Swiss-Prot record:
Belongs to the lipase chaperone family. Its main location: membrane. SUPFAM superfamilies: Lipase chaperone-like. Keywords: Cell inner membrane, Cell membrane, Chaperone, Lipid degradation, Lipid metabolism, Membrane, Transmembrane, Transmembrane helix. May be involved in the folding of the extracellular lipase during its passage through the periplasm. It comes from Acinetobacter venetianus (strain ATCC 31012 / DSM 23050 / BCRC 14357 / CCUG 45561 / CIP 110063 / KCTC 2702 / LMG 19082 / RAG-1). It is a single-pass membrane protein. This is Lipase chaperone. One of its GO terms (biological process) is lipid catabolic process. It holds the Pfam family Lipase_chap. The chain crosses the membrane at residues 10-30.
Length: 346
């Protein structure tokens, strides 16, 4: 295994570095933390009936574990590898998580050292039948990562071109097929493939000028619902907030009405969430009026002929009488800073 190994979190394909980081980022954010649950998306066609799941170390006498790189020492080894009651390796994304955990310290240790560490860990924690297969997958994974370096973008490649990005993702899928069978691909790369495709479809929706903002919200909500349940929940929580901000800006830029905003929110989040957001809007409007009145009165104090000490005392009294809670007082002071900076810049 010659050549420099590129950590999966920082794959470099020349000019497409930023593209892959964009596409792979979501996978790492929403990657299931423990992988100890029965994951339908990764194990439903792999796990035999009546299989008893066991952690890699549950019923195995551990051998000598590798010495971790300095940055990993003190952390829990992220290797949620599972074996069945017969000591056979169960294919889950936890295998890949294990490999990536060790390779995240590339630079502190060489590729060869990290491969040796992973082998040592697998041999120490897995029964022989499982460790042999896991080591085979490790060798294939390293070879796969090396092969990714040979991918070349097409001439005129642009990172905001959805079709060009789709070709990159399709190329990656073809490379995976060179090193893994269908079950292995589903286990190791199933989440990533689903999330990459989700991201591309999301870009297509935003780029579609024939869709209204409400229609975009509806399509995005459908897109999230089409993800496997294990992924959809995490994506929904994080992505809906970002989409809400972007679609709100679109409506405001077009001079949309309050009803336009309401319709978009209902399509994206549902009526109950839309009700809550309207309440937040009303509370924010009241707050904005209150703080604007306070800042205006504060400006009058600052423009007065009183000495600095008297001004500060008057402002403190005004602030305390205008805002009734500690949180509002702190927030008001933050607005003061922004207001003063804006005044100096004008």
């Amino acid at each position: 295994m010659s050549g420099k190994f590129i950590n999966h979190k920082t794959i470099v394909f020349g000019v497409i570095t930023s593209v892959l980081l964009l596409l792979l980022l979501i996978y790492y954010v929403f990657k299931p933390e423990a992988q100890t649950q029965n994951q339908n998306i990764n194990t439903q066609t792999i796990q035999p009936e009546n299989t008893v799941l066991e952690s890699a170390t549950a019923n195995n006498k551990q051998g000598k574990l590798p010495t971790l790189a300095a940055s990993l020492q003190g952390t829990e080894i992220d290797c949620p590898i599972q074996v069945d009651a017969n000591g056979k390796l169960i294919l889950t994304v936890g295998i890949r998580s294990c490999f990536d955990y060790f390779f995240s310290s590339l630079g502190e240790k060489t590729e060869a050292e990290l491969v040796a560490d992973i082998r040592q860990y697998l041999l120490a924690t897995l029964p022989e039948s499982a460790s042999n297969y896991a080591i085979y997958l490790l060798d294939q994974y390293v070879a796969y990562m090396h092969a990714l370096q040979n991918l070349k973008p097409n001439a005129g490649f642009k990172s905001n071109n959805v079709d060009a990005l789709q070709k990159v993702v399709d190329q990656m899928a073809k490379v995976q097929q060179q090193f893994f069978n269908a079950a292995e691909i589903n286990a190791l790369f199933g989440n990533e493939r689903n999330l990459n495709q989700f991201n591309l479809e999301q870009m297509r929706i935003h780029a579609n000028k024939n869709l209204t903002t409400q229609e975009k919200a509806t399509e995005l909500a459908k897109l999230i619902d089409e993800l496997p349940p294990a992924l959809a929940d995490g994506v929904r929580v994080s992505m809906q907030f970002a989409e809400l901000q972007q679609l709100t800006k679109e409506i405001q830029a077009k001079g949309g009405s309050a009803q336009d905003l309401r319709s978009m929110r209902e399509s994206l989040l549902g009526p109950e969430a839309a009700d809550r957001l309207e309440k937040v809007d009303q509370e924010e409007a009241v707050w904005q009026t209150q703080v604007n009145q306070y800042l205006s009165a504060r400006d009058q104090i600052l423009k007065s002929d009183a000495n600095d000490a008297s001004k500060q005392q008057s402002i403190a009294e005004l602030r305390n009488s205008s805002f009734g809670t500690k949180e509002d007082l702190l927030r008001a002071q933050s607005y003061e800073v922004m207001h003063d900076q804006k005044s100096k810049g004008s």
